[in-house]
Amino acid sequence: MQNTELLLKKLTLEEKCALLSGAETFKTRGMPEHGIPQIWLSDGPHGLRKQAGESDHLGLNPSVPATCFPTASAVANSWDAALGEEIGAALGEEAAAQEVSVVLGPGLNMKRNPLCGRSFEYFSEDPYLAGKLAAGYIRGIQSMGVAACPKHFAVNSQETRRMASDSIVDERTLREIYLTGFEIAVKEGHPRSIMSSYNLVNGTYANENKHLLMEILRGEWGFDGAVITDWGGSNDHALGVKNGSTLEMPAPGGDSVRELLAAVESGKITESDIDARLSELLPLVFDTKAALDAAPREFDAAAHHALARRAAEESLVLLKNEGALLPLAAGTKVAVIGDFAKNPRYQGAGSSMVNSTQVDVLLDKLIDSELNVIGYQQGFDRHGKPDAALQKSACELATQADTVILCMGLDEIAESEGLDRSNLRLAQNQLDLLQAVAAVNPKIVVVLYSGSVVETPWLDNCQALLYAALGGQAGAGAVADALTGKVNPCGKLAETWPLAYADVPSAADFATRRKTVEYREGLYIGYRYFTTAEKAVRFPFGYGMSYTTFAYSDMAADEEGVSLTVTNTGSVAGTEIVQLYVAKKNSELFRPAKELKGFARVTLAPGEKQRITITLDDKAFRFWNVKANRWEIEGGEYELLVGASVEDIRLCEKISVHGTATVHPYEDRNLDCYYKGDVLHVSDADFEKLLGHPIPKGKTKIDRNLTLGELNHARSPLGWLVWLVLTILLDASYKRGKPDLNILFQYNMPLRALAKMTNGAISMGMVDGIVMELQGFWILGLVRVIYEAIKNVVLNAQMEKRLRGA
């Protein structure tokens, strides 16, 4: 094992700077002459994605086979941190077997809005639940000697303009909603690394944000690991290093090294800043490499498939079961309809896409079950194209069955990294099919596949609804067992399902092309809004049915937590997820009507009862006092609410809590809309009162951070031409129903990323020449690009020669 302090004394400043950026798409820079190995990083929120051949960060090229577990959005419905730890351990084992040192996950972004195209990679709208689950994944991954890298830190809630948007959020909302999940993950999971997000937060890029990285992450939480940029996410490398960012990825080449050297020479940063970052990076490199050297080069694929199936079982959510249609009895004549039954949708698209070791198919599992499968019909084109013949054949089959199992859902391109959803609806051809089938056979079980919320105005057309989410490669077996009663669904929703998208508090301001993203709703995301505003929803946070019933009784409560008795009052074994919410009536602060502060899973046989305890931690009663700039507690009476969902509260006890608050955070501000939870249309004036300063105006500037999708603002024919070509290609891909993820990434990419993602082929000086061209200085810009290109080639060659010691 290398001694980092001694090693730092041996390295030249240039060598030190070179170590702080990647060498290839997923590899760090090694220096064998100093005993510093090169290590692999790999995507892997729900399955490893190591690309043995040509690598990319969007999941476009195939990867080495790995187990595809249910996505984070699915596993979150299990409310089982221990299960997350098991999945994490399997991910870590597969990473070690494939010689991957850092697993880039789990994803901890808060689900501010259900249209986020990447919601399937994230756990919940609630930071407490998300943090607890993420901590489990992290502990599991790192139990195998591999480093976890939770992401994306922070306030990154949309894919639109994700590399160049500025999240404008007040400090209390930042702390209580968008950072608490990361805080729990860091303090309880102890990750060796963390990934910064692409976006700016209140005017400063997250990767160089001193408030986020130094004051909060490293200062308050005690994080001492490596902060890794998202791929191409570095804006000012030197400022990032100074303010706590460790490793710039993927492969910016020698220009990045020269940027740091120049910053040291100018006094912008010091060599001590660079040493501090290497003291975070090098132990990670040495420790993980040593663990990988001792790890076996294979894993038990069958055992991991079995774990993936159990995870899918625990993640299923029964949303409707009219007349106890489910479970289906042996011998029931069933018609299986829907393309997803034969061609499963089990994961999302983008950088998390896994090349699965195997994939189970629901139709096959149903045929192998005790049901009498009388036939299968595709029913609809999964990409939305109307097809009357498919619908007619499905209806003819449905007339012959006792029960119809209809598999519906979102297609592969509806949810993906790189683009946000345009609506919450299922394809119209699927809804038409459901209505047509219901007309000939009302006994319909809908099995729904999606990574996030969908609107369900069609709910009356089915008797049962089983939410399969994106259940991973073994999800089909879990669904079949749930339909037949071998598995009793126990999952509960980790996000609210609204009646309509218009009800979502951020609906009016989500995924616009504006530079600034204004978090006007403040604390009120998800159930925090719906319960406070008393707005009806389709399915509330924490909701999920079972084939049995549970009774809650004999509650006792104090500041430490609650205890109660849970009894299985039904006829089959089952698992209940008991939820603890905290509420404060007549608060002097504005706050959500109730907030999740604890939960517990309990598995009971028929008639069995068990006494359970749910403890409260230091986050149970705290709020961020923006005036005192610290966590405080408002004293007084609180309600501890125990229930089966945020709306189904079974027991309540009141306790008195001693307060610490000495100054009212909002005594000089009129914030009536926030006290009422009336945040659908927050005015500029009210949002500025919440922020405590004027709303920043995001102006389009022709500089390094101009995105390719904004080149129509350029004063250059070349810029307009590039913009026009990209726009035409992108629009064409949308019309085909298959948005091109690569073009989408380029469209939202700032010019500076050209210098961060081309392995040194393009320097920042060349980017500055391009900017001059776009500003209208056509000749000077072209000359600058040519000059900087020649200079870059020469300097890169000289630097590589020095670094190789030649």
What are these regions (language model features)?
Residues M1-K619, F623, E637-L641, V646, ...:
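Glycoside hydrolase catalytic-domain context in secreted enzymes
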